[in-house]
UniProtKB/Swiss-Prot annotation:
Compositionally biased intervals (Basic and acidic residues): 118-128
Family: Belongs to the MecA family.
Naturally occurring in which organism (per UniProt): Staphylococcus aureus (strain Mu50 / ATCC 700699)
Region described as Disordered: spans on this chain: 118-137
Entry note about domains: The N-terminal domain probably binds unfolded/aggregated proteins; the C-terminal domain interacts with ClpC.
Gene responsible for this protein: mecA
Protein name: Adapter protein MecA
C-alpha cells in the first residue's frame, strides 16, 4: 500500500488487489460484504495512523476510485466546526455510511471500467500487435506526457481546448501512473503540435517513456477521443 500525505487534513493511498488479499480480504469482500468492507477500511485507517500520524478525530470525507489493479482512496478530515463536535459514535456511524455509499458508487464505476478494458482489449486483438500499429504510424508525429494521478487526467479532459481534431490518442496506465500519447496527422502544422503540447503541460508532465516501452509494459485503458470518454465515465473534480 502506498500512502501520500497531501496536507495536515488529507491523505491519499493506493492499494492493489494483491495487497488487499494479503491482508486477508478478497475483492468480493470489498464490494459485496458490508461488514468486511467496513473492517477493511478501518484496518487501513489504523495503518495510515501508524505511518502518517493521521488520527481520526470527528467525521471523515472519503473519495474512492477503483482501477483494474487496485483502489485509490483520498481521505480528508472535516473542517466544519459543528461536525467536529459530533460524538465519536455519531462520527463512526457517519463514516460507515459514507464507506457503504462510496463502495456502491465505486463498484458501479469498476464495472464500467472493466467493460471498457474488455472493449479495448478486443479492439487491440482485432487490430493486430502493438508493434505493427506503431510502425503504421511512422508518418505521424507523437507527443507523450505523464499525469500524476487520475484527477489530473479528469481536469485535463474538462478544461482542455483542442486546437485540432486531426489526431489519434491513447491513455496508458503502468505502475499506477497514467501516460497520454497523441499521434498527430503528418500534415498538422508543427506550431499546432507545439501549442497542443504546451496546453497538455498545464495538467501533465514531460516524460522520457517511449511508445515502444508503453506498448510493451503498459495497458491501454482508453483510446479514440480519450477526453470525451473520461468526461463520460467521471464527473468533473472540484477544488
Amino acid at each position: 500500500m502506498r500512502i501520500e500525505r497531501v496536507d495536515d487534513t488529507t491523505v491519499k493511498l493506493f492499494i492493489t488487489y494483491s495487497d488487499i488479499e494479503a491482508r486477508g480480504f478478497s475483492r468480493e469482500d470489498l464490494w459485496t460484504n458490508r461488514k468486511r468492507g467496513e473492517e477493511f477500511f478501518w484496518s487501513m485507517m489504523d495503518e495510515i495512523n501508524e505511518e502518517e500520524d493521521f488520527v481520526v478525530e470527528g467525521p471523515l470525507w472519503i473519495q474512492v476510485h477503483a482501477f483494474e489493479k487496485g483502489v485509490e482512496v483520498t481521505i480528508s478530515k472535516s473542517k466544519n466546526e459543528d461536525m467536529m463536535n459530533m460524538s465519536d459514535d455519531d462520527a463512526t456511524d457517519q463514516f460507515d455510511e459514507q464507506v457503504q455509499e462510496l463502495l456502491a458508487q465505486t463498484l458501479e464505476g469498476e464495472d464500467q471500467l472493466e467493460e471498457l478494458f474488455e472493449q479495448r482489449t478486443k479492439e487491440k486483438e482485432a487490430q493486430g500487435s502493438k508493434r505493427q500499429k506503431s510502425s503504421a504510424r511512422k508518418n505521424t508525429r507523437t507527443i507523450i506526457v505523464k499525469f500524476n494521478d487520475l484527477e489530473d487526467v479528469i481536469n485535463y479532459a474538462y478544461h482542455s481546448n483542442p486546437i485540432t481534431t486531426e489526431f489519434e490518442d491513447l491513455l496508458y496506465m503502468v505502475d499506477g501512473t497514467y501516460y497520454y500519447a497523441v499521434h498527430f496527422d503528418s500534415h498538422v502544422d508543427q506550431e499546432v503540435i507545439n501549442d497542443s503540447y504546451s496546453q497538455l503541460l498545464e495538467f501533465a508532465y514531460p516524460t522520457d517513456r517511449t511508445e515502444v516501452y508503453l506498448n510493451d509494459y503498459a495497458k491501454i485503458i482508453m483510446s479514440h477521443n480519450v477526453t470525451a470518454q473520461v468526461r463520460r465515465y467521471f464527473p468533473e473534480t472540484t477544488e
